[in-house]
């Protein structure tokens, strides 16, 4: 299933419109946040977490289920992609779905925007945008 999603023509066309036709899918990840399990994704930058340079790539997030603030949708720090890479601390919280636990401290939540998506919708973001997600409270 993940291979089909990663090579979906609509997704590839959207990515191509941003970075050109030389596209490489370097990985896929599922973040499963079931109700009551307490999982979250700490605020981080994919450029720091993944470590690919130059930063001329994008990350695609495809919602498998409806995603909203109540069930812990992704939040992005608006405009943070215009800044340099931020310092990340190692935070090995067992509930953090990032396996390496990289965390940006003191992200001003009032500057973050929830990415509310319906199942099947997609968000593309720059590798230096600060993003994370809260707990699933449903």
Where are these regions (language model features)?
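Glycine-rich, flexible loop/turn motifs
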Residues: 1, 37-39, 45-46, 60, ...
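Non-heme Fe(II)-dependent double-stranded beta-helix
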Residues: 1-52
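Short, conserved clusters of charged catalytic residues that mark active-site
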Residues: 10, 59, 108
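Short, hydrophobic/aromatic alpha-helical segments in well-folded domains
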Residues: 14, 46, 60-63, 129-132
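Short, conserved beta-strand element in jelly-roll/cupin
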Residues: 18, 44, 51-69, 116-119, ...
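Short acidic/polar capping segments at secondary-structure boundaries
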Residues: 30-37, 47-48, 55-56, 64-69, ...
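Double-stranded beta-helix
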Residues: 67-134
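Short, compositionally biased
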Residues: 136-138
């Amino acid at each position: 299933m993940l291979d089909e999603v990663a090579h979906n023509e609509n997704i590839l066309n959207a990515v191509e419109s941003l970075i050109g036709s030389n596209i490489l899918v370097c990985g896929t990840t599922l973040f499963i946040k079931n109700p009551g399990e307490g999982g979250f994704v700490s605020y981080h930058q994919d450029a720091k977490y993944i470590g690919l340079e130059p930063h001329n790539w994008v990350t695609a997030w495809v919602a498998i289920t409806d995603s909203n603030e109540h069930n812990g949708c992704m939040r992005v720090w608006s405009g943070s992609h215009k800044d340099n890479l931020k310092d990340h601390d190692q935070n090995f919280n067992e509930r953090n779905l990032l396996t390496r636990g990289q965390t940006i401290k003191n992200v001003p939540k009032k500057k973050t925007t929830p990415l509310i998506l319906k199942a099947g919708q997609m968000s593309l973001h720059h590798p230096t945008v600060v993003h994370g997600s809260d707990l699933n409270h449903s």
